[in-house]
Amino acid sequence: MKVGAVVITMGNRPEELRALLDSVAKQDGDPVEVVVVGNGAPVPEVPEGVRTVELPENLGIPGGRNVGIEAFGPGGGDVDILLFLDDDGLLARTDTAELCRRAFADDDELGIISFRIADPDTGETQRRHVPRLRASDPMRSSRVTTFLGGANAVRTRVLGQVGGLPDAFFYAHEETDLAWRALDAGWMIDYRSDMVLNHPTTAPSRHAVYHRMVARNRVWLARRNLPALLVPVYLGVWMALTLLRRPSRPALKAWFGGFREGWATPCGPRRPMRWRTVWRLTRLGRPPVI
């Protein structure tokens, strides 16, 4: 199976980007073709053979990754598998691409693989980087209902069938939107602890727009994908969880601003998942109300 990789960059981490690209080049088996997308910024110097696309403006994470997908033909169809990797990450092992090939070849239902993210210094995997509710053991691989945006592999047939990431989300929850559409189309998602991306431990709230976009996109996610009966339940649960976390006053103000924005602005096409998909998510351990 032919493997490609998409990396988006703001051009501000040239050393980390080079280390990532070197780790991709060291993968066992056939070479992985790489496209680096400069998301509103020039692409730093990259090794020979790495293709680059420079965008005149920042299209956000999903928009930038979608450009990278199309660089491999419509829906990424020039390759069988696409890796999506953060530009400050590093593939910890040289057999990751081969493990992906083997996993997809052995399981026709498998559409997406979420890698384990580990801190390069401590080896720690943050709880939020284990894409399931029972996240206490990051070394346990399992079927899951979503995936990590900057450390994953996607079978391109999934993208050809259900489309790419939602451009308008810009940042936050775009992976879950794609995951739900893939699951509704019959695909499965695996979390694999043996496929590791080393990545420094960070807090998502480091992004200035975090609280607003998390809330807005949560509303869009529900409006786009959930049966009407579940929309208020899902959003009510997440509002309660947000309040229980006792965010700062500015963060809470930004969150409620984003929540209102999610209702007041277009969310894109609405394609509610089937009830059997709701049941599938429930059996996988995460009903779409949390």
Which ranges hold each PLM region?
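Non-catalytic, C-terminal membrane-associated alpha-helical segments of glycosyltransferases
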Residues: 213, 228-290
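Conserved donor NDP-sugar-binding/catalytic core segment of glycosyltransferases
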Residues: 90, 94-126
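Glycine-rich, basic loop-to-helix element that forms the pyrophosphate-binding segment
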Residues: 55-74
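Short beta-strand-to-loop acidic/aromatic patch adjacent to the donor-nucleotide binding site
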Residues: 77-90
